[in-house]
């Protein structure tokens, strides 16, 4: 049994979020824990597949198949526990107004993920890992990213969880040209940047 219902992992690009997901997926495989990787866009799903996370789907295709195909649900029936890794979570809206065919509609993407999964996945223990960059702009018409807010899950869904932020960027050499330019820009604008 999982002690909590969700975990939020944040960090800037290059901080190792995808590596954490890959390592967690390896642990799932070792211990026969079911898992599914999801991404907000098709491009992000493709990137994760190319990084070794071959079962990654878009959130929309996941929700569609859960609600439409009973055979799709059967593949989860032999697992006691299941973990969902959801990348690009900073883009997931909940309650925002979107315009489809020039008509305003409310978009409850986060609710769709949560309720569709709990309704259709027959596992006793379901756990969500929301992964994203909290420094990105929030979804349209939002003041913050609901899928990266621990308190939002507690208040809206009554779930228990924890969060962690990766702060060190590993992808770039600290003395790369991009890093130097960014550091100089920040120093010139009186930001607190270590020399």
Spans of features found by a protein language model:
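Conserved ATP-binding/catalytic motifs of P-loop helicase motor domains
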Residues: 1-195
């Amino acid at each position: 049994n999982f002690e909590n219902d969700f975990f939020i992992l944040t960090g800037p690009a290059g901080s190792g979020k995808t590596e954490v997901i890959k390592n967690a997926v390896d642990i799932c495989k070792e211990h026969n824990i079911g898992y599914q990787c999801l991404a907000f866009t098709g491009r992000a799903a493709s990137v994760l597949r190319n990084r070794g996370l071959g079962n990654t789907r878009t959130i929309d295709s996941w929700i569609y198949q859960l609600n439409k195909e009973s055979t799709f649900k059967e593949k989860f029936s032999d697992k006691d526990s299941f973990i969902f890794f959801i990348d690009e979570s900073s883009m997931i809206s909940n309650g925002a107004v979107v315009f489809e065919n020039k008509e305003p509609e409310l978009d409850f993407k986060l609710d769709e993920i949560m309720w569709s999964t709990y309704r259709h996945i027959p596992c006793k223990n379901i756990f969500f890992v929301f992964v994203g960059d909290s420094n990105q702009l929030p979804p349209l018409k939002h003041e913050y990213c609901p899928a990266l807010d621990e308190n939002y899950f507690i208040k809206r869904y009554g779930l228990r969880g924890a969060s962690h932020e990766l702060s060190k960027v590993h992808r770039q050499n600290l003395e790369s040209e991009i890093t130097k330019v960014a550091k100089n820009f920040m120093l010139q604008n009186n930001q607190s940047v270590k020399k």
